[in-house]
Amino acid sequence: MKRLGIFFFYEKNGDVDDFITYYLADLNKNLTELVVVCNGKLSAQGRAAFEQFTDNIIVRENKGLDVWAYKTALDSYGWAKLTEFDEIVMTNSTLMGPVRPLKEMFDAMWENQDLDFWGLSIHHGAKSNPFKGKHLYNYLPVHIQSHFIVYRQRFVKAPELQNYWDNMPMIESYTDSVQRYE
């Protein structure tokens, strides 16, 4: 099993709290490789916290929210390298836990080989779209929430997914993020 983790982080001062290192300590046990993408500042304390788990730390302008942080990591690897992984986990610093070892979840989900992608939680959608401004739909579809999404290798190899990420427009707001990514 070869699994890449992409961890998105934002905190206005760039400081990493203990709940994040607690999460990463367990997550990292299930990864072959980890890249951390920080939008904005990363303090010396924050860098030291992440360096416990990886030297692959990208600090970038705070632009494009989580979507463009993930895109930055994907672009840094390129599709040829990304397709070498059995799974790619995209997650962020809005999760707390785990309460139980993540290995249990990863093992259970790996048994279901019919999945091209999966996530930790879903939003159940709405008949009308609660977001103002740009809309792709007049309703809010049921969707996997962006704080934890896993892509399987065959999905990463799909030209449709590669095209989706290669042509992802700049994300300007939370609404854009939900509408175009989740």
Task: Describe the residue ranges of each PLM region.
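N-terminal anchoring/stem segment of glycosyltransferases
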Residues: 1-65, 75-87
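A short, conserved beta-strand element in the Rossmann-like catalytic core
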Residues: 64, 68, 96-98
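Catalytic core and acceptor-binding pocket of nucleotide-sugar-dependent glycosyltransferases
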Residues: 117-121, 138-182
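Short acidic, S/G/P-rich loop/turn micro-motifs used as interaction or catalytic elements
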Residues: 10-15, 41-42, 95-98, 125, ...
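Conserved donor-nucleotide/metal-binding helix-loop-beta segment in metal-dependent transferases, i.e.
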Residues: 97-133
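Well-ordered, non-membrane alpha-helical segments in soluble/globular domains
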Residues: 17-24, 102-106, 176-182
